[in-house]
Structures are given as structure tokens and as C-alpha cells.
Amino acid sequence: MPEAPKKESLEVFDLTLDQKNKQKLQLIEELTSNADQVQRQVLEEILTRNADVEYLRRHDLNGRTDRETFKNIMPVITYEDIEPEINRIANGDKSPILSSKPISEFLTSSGTSGGERKLMPTIEEELDRRSLLYSLLMPVMSQFVPGLENGKGMYFLFIKSESKTPGGLPARPVLTSYYKSSHFKERPYDPYTNYTSPNETILCSDSYQSMYSQMLCGLCQHQEVLRVGAVFASGFIRAIKFLEKHWIELVRDIRTGTLSSLITDPSVREAVAKILKPSPKLADFVEFECKKSSWQGIITRLWPNTKYVDVIVTGTMSQYIPTLDYYSNGLPLVCTMYASSECYFGVNLRPLCKPSEVSYTLIPSMAYFEFLPVHRNNGVTNSINLPKALTEKEQQELVDLVDVKLGQEYELVVTTYAGLCRYRVGDLLRVTGFKNKAPQFSFICRKNVVLSIDSDKTDEVELQNAVKNAVTHLVPFDASLSEYTSYADTSSIPGHYVLFWELCLDGNTPIPPSVFEDCCLAVEESFNTVYRQGRVSDKSIGPLEIKIVEPGTFDKLMDYAISLGASINQYKTPRCVKFAPIIELLNSRVVDSYFSPKCPKWVPGHKQWGSN
């Protein structure tokens, strides 16, 4: 890691830092104040440079760059529509198929989003755009939490060892791409990217060695840590669970100043050796805190100067909020940015807001954005599960960035510099406000993560809320839900929903079977009217089942997903599973099973899908 500036230069450096912050904040003001002009310019630039690519020529755009012609001619697409082109590029076709600039690599989407690992084309200059968005985060944050430049961030960041396509292009997760780039590895000294983890520990492909060495370095520099985090809330909690399991070995290393022999990566050992020194006093401190029966507030106990926890807690990650609050003593939970493999989108301009109020301001220069209106009635999503191809009328419904309406929900559609054209990202967003002319969105869910037996369609948000309602029955028994997933079991007729629950038991009071049956019913009562009609009237859906699994089951699930190629950095517990080996893994660790004891309430006359 670069050294900190000498003390005598701090005054000048602070002034420069303040000026840099003001420049970045001014850039946000300019981009959001001129959002529509910037969007027109972005589209014109993309279409001009890609005028001769095969995909645009096939649709007879003929070099035109105006927005109206673009909207009338170019179709709104999904991944399946361009999969043949993607495969040609992956197999080595270097002709300008999607982009006039060479495709430098493929970014693999998370294996738990929609169930497939998709290859997203990217070009070299996209790294500049990603870096630009990263550069906006801390100037925004410094408005709310001053002095962050005086310490370090303890972030648990990981890479996945990359693969190659048949044509020789790297295929890797977007964060692996960024961490392996010169933009990250050779970044100039910046107090805002001054981390406790040396680059070598982040770039270690062995997840155990990477986690161990990053945690050790974080403990050694515990007084310097001002902020902690990971990408997802689940990843940060996994780091704390790792500490719970391995603190004895970590304390031994700190006491002796000798790194565990289990860490075999030479570059990691060399990097850690520059930080790890014998410190019996620090070892005693860490041991004293970790030996306590309660781990409540462990983050603020071990890293006492921490100001906030920087993790994604929107969408289904919101279920981890109580656990984060427990470990952090209620520190602010900060979601800083919104990004995906397809494109980096926006930033949170109010980072200290409550997790339930997180909104992202889309930065108009990142890509050309359009929005497909989505209508949700009584919790049932309609157009988010539209057929792959939109009708001509639905294509005409798309609106531009500055034309979205407050409170309306939309599916995000992007046109990128790297060659995605009117591509449905699949994220459902709700407009919560505006920064000048640029809208701000809350993230609702990823589309198509649903349970379905018959005509019922239960989306991710509905499932999350139903589970949240059900677990209140566990509170009197000092029990909570650690993790969960689900699947639609159609091996019997009628089919039924199955939830796998892993519990965290703090008390000794046994939980009666009737309580879990009440949980089953509470989940069903929370579902939409179509589901309840299927249970009560149509008899097309059987009683919901909750299966309790052994502790550690969801760690096994993650390990299995990683063994198949999922990125540890991007991994999120899937809320719905369909892959038979995963269901077999979960079923092999079931300790108890409970069914809903009766049908949920349902009143006729509110049918969502009638013949009329």
C-alpha cells in the first residue's frame, strides 16, 4: 500500500483534498442539473461511434443518432436476444458485432441473479467510468462524516480466479475485473482508498487465506480503522462469523508476530509481514473481547473508532440489518452506490439515511437510461414478469431518465458504450425523488426471482415480507432466522412451497411444533390473493412447508456455489432454488419439518387473473 504523506505536508494536502471534494460535488451538480442534455449527448456518442457495428446495421439504424429514431427502430431486448452475438465474441469473432471498440473481457453476472451466469461485454474505457463513480463516493460521504481521511477503511474484498472464453477473453465478475486492474492496483495514494488490507491479500484467490489475512491486518490496525464494510451485508457478516471461529489462531499470530503456516501464498505472507509485529498487549485485548459470552457490539469493541458500516442492505440484503445492528451496536449502515455487471448506475447522496430510505441518484453520463413502467397490484407483480419480447405498445411505454414519475415503479433498461442496446437489466426501481433534474430510485428487487406452482406468482419482495411476518413467532423463544431460501416442490400433486430455515438460537427454551406451524400459516397469510385462492378455492397449491436445517447449512450452500464458479464477492443467498443438487444438499441437512395446519384466509371476488 502507498505510504501516508509526511506530516509537514498535511496542511497542503488537506487543502488539495478539500478542493478535490468540491470538484466532485460540483460535477454531480452539473450532471444532474443538465440530465437530459447529458443523456442526449451520451446516446449520440454511443450511436456515432457504433454506427457501423453489425447489430445496429441489422436493424437499419443507418448511422442516425437522434433519440426518436433510435426508440422507433431499436427493440428492447433481454440477454437471450443477443446470446448468439455474445457467443460469437466469446468464441473469438473480433469483428465489430456489438461495439466498435474491441471487447476487452466479459463480466459474469452473479450466479444467483436469475439463476444463470451471463456474459456481459465490456471495453477498456469502462474502467474509467467505474473509477469515476467510485471517486464520487467519499466526497459525498465527507459531507456527513468529516475526518475520514485521517484513518483507514477495513473492507473485506475478494476476487475470483478468472476463466477464459474459447476466444481467449477473460470472463470474471465485475469487481474481480476492477481489483485486478491498474486503476485499483496502481492507484495513487488517496486517503479515501487507504485500506487495512494490502492489495496482495485482496488479490489472493484462496478465499480462506484472503479472509484470514485481511482479518489479521484489520485487527493489527484496529485503532486506525474509521469505517468497515464489504460489498454485501451477508459478506461482512460472514467475516464476523469467520472471526468468531478463528479468533484463537488470530490472537496467537498477533501475540507471536508470526503468520499461521496455513497461509501459504508467498505474496500474502510478505505483505502481512510488513504489518504483523509481536504485540502481547493487542493479543490480550482481542482475546478478552472475543472470550466474552456475548458478541453484541463486537465491531465497536474491537475497532472503537468506527463511524459506520459500508455494505449493501437494500433488497433482500435488508434481512441482515438486525444482525448488523447487533454486531455494530447500531452504527449507521451505509449503502453508497448502485452498480451491476451490465453498468455502474448511481450513488447515494444521503448515505446516513435509514436502510429503508436508501435512494440512488443515477449519474446521467454512465449510460443511456430508459424505464419500462411496472404495475404492481396488491403485491403481485405484473409487467416485471412480462414475456421476453415486449409488444409494440409496451415498447412505446418506455420513458427517459428525466420523464419518470414520482412514486412510479420501473424496470431499468440501458444502452451502454460497451454494446448493450436497450437491454433490460431486470431491476425493479421506484422513483423516490429528484436531485435537480436527475431522478432518485430505491431498489425494490431483481425480477424473475419467484415461486410458482400454478397461476400464482410470488416475487422476492413478497416472500421477504412474508418471512419477516412469520419470524415474529420465534421472538418469545430467543430465536431468530439466520438464513433462508425456498423452492416450489412439484414432486407431489398439488405442489407446494418449501422454505428452508436456518435458525440462530440464543435461549434454551425448546420451540414447540405448533409455533413453526404458526410460522407456516403466517407466511401463507402474507401472500397475495392468487396464492391464497389456489390454496383455499382452487386446491391447486398444497400446504406450505418449513424445513429447519442444521447450523452451517447456508455456508455449505455458498461453498458449493463457489465451487461451481460463483464469485465470493458477489455471492448472495438465492431466495429461490431450482437446481436439483442444491435442493439435495439442503434436504440432506434437514432436522425437522412442519406444514401449515390449515388454509389461509381468502375472500372471493378479488381474482387477479380472470377471463374478463
Curated annotation (Swiss-Prot):
Its EC number is 6.3.2.-. GO terms for molecular function: indole-3-acetic acid amido synthetase activity. Keywords: Ligase. Pfam families: GH3, GH3_C, GH3_M. InterPro entries: GH3, GH3_C, GH3_M. It comes from the Eukaryota. Induction: By auxin. Signal peptide: none annotated. GO terms for biological process: camalexin biosynthetic process; positive regulation of camalexin biosynthetic process; response to auxin. It is an enzyme of class 6 (ligase). Catalyzes the synthesis of indole-3-acetic acid (IAA)-amino acid conjugates, providing a mechanism for the plant to cope with the presence of excess auxin. Strongly reactive with Glu, Gln, Trp, Asp, Ala, Leu, Phe, Gly, Tyr, Met, Ile and Val. Little or no product formation with His, Ser, Thr, Arg, Lys, or Cys. Also active on pyruvic and butyric acid analogs of IAA, PAA and the synthetic auxin naphthaleneacetic acid (NAA). The two chlorinated synthetic auxin herbicides 2,4-D and 3,6-dichloro-o-anisic acid (dicamba) cannot be used as substrates. Belongs to the IAA-amido conjugating enzyme family. This is Indole-3-acetic acid-amido synthetase GH3.5. It comes from Arabidopsis thaliana. The lineage of its organism: Eukaryota, Viridiplantae, Streptophyta, Embryophyta, Tracheophyta.
